């Protein structure tokens, strides 16, 4: 993170009045604050798990909802309970929200009884009760631009909209996910962009996160009602429930291809929380069963794949756009392999460009190389990431980080390695190791045919390596995989089964509409990935931006800790024990370095920077890498093993050693080593 000089900035704030706001934003959350973050207080009052937290706009009130069906409004700065009321729900409360511009008087709750209730806190009464959902209500969302309107997401697959100005006791369906994904889809979370209140993000079953334009949907519905044939349409027209352009999907590029493997191991992917950055340009997703992902909504990118020179001309045309640099903006996320299709540049006769690193970055690179040599893969990745942030045009750093990703083998590491290899080759077409690692990554990501073509291309570009033991070993692996794939397809054909389904969360082909397939194929890839936590046990686990400039990312975890990462480097910087079992909720204060957390324990915990004289060791997880490795193993354990781990049992093979402990990936690489340069 950038160094801070508070004395200098205090003087500037006194001299320049306009600097007051920037001062507040800059010092909202800083690296020294993060290092001193510790437990300030525990708020006691609930008798069950605390499933949701919500700050008011000023930050002087904190609302909580619990399994005990009560909501409590706290004065968090003085650690006082101001109000406690039974909400009228008959099951666990999963979401609580203050209605904007209502003087902190109106509170909305959603619960497992499928109900949404609206409460007047001044008289401690429930003034509206909505029972339109047919399954558990998981999230409520509000928008400052529409102070009388709010939305709910429930496990019946519906996103409903409520208008408190209307006398009706019913809501209207804004989005029906079952129209697109079939009757088994469940909506889990939603949020409204703080800078564009017409933009609604929805997380549901499967790896895809959906963005909708509320205004376009309303205009579409209005035009349908006014059309001469309106009488033959229902509110959600089954032929075209949403207008073209009203939805955009986002997905981590490797997940659609991984779905069959995850499904076979009963590993469920579901977005448990979505939130926008304060400036509305980024979307953060806590993907249940996987990692935390950040999507850039301004500079969108397609998932990365591979194109061979012989299949591409000097100028490619895809989707009407010309591409001459080898990177295309195709529309695919794993179904068709031509998105961000990277065409390897010709390398015959080229001279490898040497980019000198400044001395301090050279030292960081050497430290990373030493960590790699000691098999400290995560430490090496973090050091390379620090260097990459300062020297984003150095091919060697990307190539070295790719090698560390390939060795570590956590979920998503091979795809990040693929991205780094492609970046290294774009910066240095003669990067031999990056070319070879690219073929290995494609193979590990199940792009077997593409891996074979990439390996053949590597042999043509670097003939001196064509008969190395590394090439021979990878070639044998690819050939065996191709034969296995061919046999599997023949058996499926003989049995009347269809081909592999890469973009479906279920095996029922007819449950996915054609419109849904198109949206999935056009989905955008992530910018950053954050690893270390575990999100498999609960489906309400949150991840949030921390800081006015979204400098940090925080997430709860199944191991009872919460994790803090630097946003730009994705490096893990702090792990704190926040619950005896599971941390689900993390809600940062709107203007202070102040964090509220909750989970299975019936308390709300408040965290802020502690005095330097205070001992913080009690809740600090010192071995962050060990905790991260244990969580990766937990995520990959079968459901029975995960249940036993949650009950406190120790399981041989899961309690020690690294995630994916086998390390034969590069054991036979011969002359083409995976060690860093």
UniProtKB/Swiss-Prot annotation:
Gene Ontology CC terms, in alphabetical order: cytosol; nucleus
Disulphide-bridged cysteine pairs: none
Highest taxon listed in the record's lineage: Eukaryota
Ranges occupied by WD repeats: 45-84, 88-129, 132-172, 182-222, 265-305, 535-575, 578-617
Pathway in which this enzyme or protein is active: Protein modification; protein ubiquitination
Keyword Cell membrane recorded: no
GO molecular function per UniProt: enzyme inhibitor activity; histone binding; histone deacetylase binding
Keyword annotations from UniProtKB, A to Z: Phosphoprotein, Repeat, TPR repeat, Ubl conjugation pathway, WD repeat
Function: May function as a substrate receptor for CUL4-DDB1 E3 ubiquitin-protein ligase complex.
Record's protein name: WD and tetratricopeptide repeats protein 1
Naturally occurring in which organism (per UniProt): Mus musculus (Mouse)
Lineage start: Eukaryota, Metazoa, Chordata, Craniata, Vertebrata
Primary gene name: Wdtc1
């Amino acid at each position: 993170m950038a160094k801070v000089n508070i004395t200098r900035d205090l003087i500037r704030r006194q001299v320049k009045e306009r600097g007051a706001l920037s001062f507040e934003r800059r010092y909202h959350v800083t690296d020294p604050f993060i290092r001193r973050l510790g437990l300030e207080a525990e708020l006691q009052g609930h008798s069950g798990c605390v499933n949701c937290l919500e700050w008011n706009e000023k930050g002087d009130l904190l609302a909580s909802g619990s399994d005990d069906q009560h909501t409590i409004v706290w004065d968090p700065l003085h650690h006082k309970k101001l109000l406690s009321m039974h909400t009228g729900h008959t099951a666990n409360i999963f979401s609580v929200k203050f209605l904007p511009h209502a003087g902190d008087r109106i509170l909305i709750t959603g619960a497992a009884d499928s109900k949404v209730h609206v409460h007047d806190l001044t008289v401690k009464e429930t003034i509206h009760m909505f029972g339109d959902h047919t399954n558990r209500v998981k999230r409520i969302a509000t928008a400052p631009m529409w102070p009388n309107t709010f939305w709910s997401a429930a496990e019946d697959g519906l996103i409903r909209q409520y208008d408190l100005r209307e006398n009706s006791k019913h809501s209207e369906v804004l989005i029906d996910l079952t129209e697109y994904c079939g009757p088994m889809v469940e909506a889990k979370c939603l949020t409204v962009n703080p800078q564009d209140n017409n933009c609604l993000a929805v997380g549901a079953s499967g790896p895809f996160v959906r963005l909708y334009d509320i205004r376009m949907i309303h205009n579409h519905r209005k035009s349908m009602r006014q059309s001469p044939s309106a009488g033959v349409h229902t509110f959600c027209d089954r032929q075209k429930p949403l207008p073209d352009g009203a939805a955009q999907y986002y997905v981590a590029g490797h997940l659609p291809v991984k779905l069959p493997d995850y499904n076979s191991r009963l590993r469920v992917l579901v977005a448990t929380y979505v939130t926008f950055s304060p400036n509305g340009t980024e979307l953060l997703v806590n993907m249940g069963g996987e990692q935390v992902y950040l999507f850039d909504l301004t500079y969108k990118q397609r998932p990365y794949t591979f194109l061979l020179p012989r299949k591409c001309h000097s100028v490619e045309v895809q989707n009407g756009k010309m591409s001459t640099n080898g990177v295309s903006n195709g529309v695919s996320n794993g179904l068709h392999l031509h998105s961000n299709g990277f065409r390897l540049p010709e390398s015959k006769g080229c001279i490898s460009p040497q980019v000198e690193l400044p001395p301090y970055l050279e030292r960081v690179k050497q430290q990373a190389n030493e960590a790699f040599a000691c098999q400290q893969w995560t430490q090496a990745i973090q050091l390379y990431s620090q260097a990459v942030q300062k020297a984003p045009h150095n091919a060697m750093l990307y190539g070295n980080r790719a090698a560390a990703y390939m060795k570590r083998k956590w979920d998503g590491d091979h795809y990040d390695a693929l991205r780094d290899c492609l970046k290294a080759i774009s910066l240095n077409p003669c990067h031999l190791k990056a070319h070879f690692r690219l073929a290995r990554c494609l193979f590990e990501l199940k792009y077997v045919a593409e891996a074979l073509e990439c390996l053949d291309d590597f042999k043509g570009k670097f003939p001196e390596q064509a008969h190395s033991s590394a090439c021979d070993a990878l070639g044998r692996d690819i050939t065996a995989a191709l034969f296995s794939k061919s046999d599997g397809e023949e058996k499926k054909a003989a049995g009347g089964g269809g081909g592999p389904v890469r973009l479906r969360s279920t095996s029922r082909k007819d449950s996915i509409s054609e419109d849904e397939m198109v949206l999935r194929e056009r989905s955008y890839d992530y910018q950053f990935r954050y690893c270390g936590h575990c999100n498999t046990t609960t489906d309400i686990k949150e991840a949030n931006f921390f800081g006015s400039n979204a400098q940090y990312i925080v997430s709860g975890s199944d191991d009872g800790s919460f994790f803090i990462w630097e946003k730009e480097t994705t490096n893990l910087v702090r792990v704190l024990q926040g619950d005896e079992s599971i941390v689900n909720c993390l809600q940062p204060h709107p203007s202070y370095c102040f964090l509220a957390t909750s989970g299975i324990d019936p308390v709300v915990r408040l965290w802020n920077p502690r005095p330097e004289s205070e001992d913080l060791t009690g809740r600090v997880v010192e071995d962050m890498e060990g905790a991260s490795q244990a969580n990766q193993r937990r995520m990959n354990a079968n459901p029975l093993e995960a249940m036993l781990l949650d009950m406190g049992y120790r399981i041989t093979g899961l309690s020690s050693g690294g995630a994916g402990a086998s390390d034969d990936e590069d054991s036979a690489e011969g002359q083409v080593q995976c060690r860093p340069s």
